[in-house]
Amino acid sequence: TGLYMTSRAGLWMDDQGCYWLDPASAGAQSWITSAVLELKNMGFHEVMLSNFRFPTSDAYIYTGDKTAALQNAMQNLLTSTASDSGTFTLSFGTNDPTLTLIDGARSRIYFEGIDAANVQTTADQSTVADKQAQIVFLATTNDTRFDSYSVLRPLTAAETIEAQKADTNN
């Protein structure tokens, strides 16, 4: 269920020692579904699958259409976790604005690693139905170009913003 090295000697591992799942694999999708449903049953209202993408390396083998594989995996995961009803939300962390959420799904796209200069372009390329509600940028800076959409920043960035507000009010 993983991505194989080009030599076919075994599973490919990234530079941080992590193996990547093959999103087209039924076994990988089943394992992810089980993990998501376990979290859902524990009472979590949202699960975000980070790094929902293929690695940027040419050291592994994948001969299929990567975007189609991700799109199909996304649809299967949304359907198998019943994210189209109730209050549970299954979301995806990616840097690919072309991934499309299925109609009626309770889901969001969390854009990872998007430069502030590309925020509007990324949002414009996205095909989600409700961009204000279904796009979330994971930002590491206080750049205001992210603020037209939902944005999550590290606590240190939020503390800096609050300190700047306090300085302005004094």
Please state what every model-predicted region is.
Residues 27-35, 43, 69-76:
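Extracytoplasmic/secreted proteins, especially bacterial periplasmic and envelope-associated proteins
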Residues 4-7, 45-71:
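Active-site-proximal loop/short-helix segments
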Residues 1-37:
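Active-site-adjacent "subsite" loops/lids of carbohydrate-active enzymes
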Residues 107-170:
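Substrate-binding cleft of secreted/luminal carbohydrate-active enzymes
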Residues 88-119:
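Substrate-binding cleft/loops of secretory-pathway carbohydrate-active enzymes
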Residues 48-50, 68-100, 136-138:
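Aromatic-lined carbohydrate-recognition surfaces of secreted/lumenal glycan-active proteins
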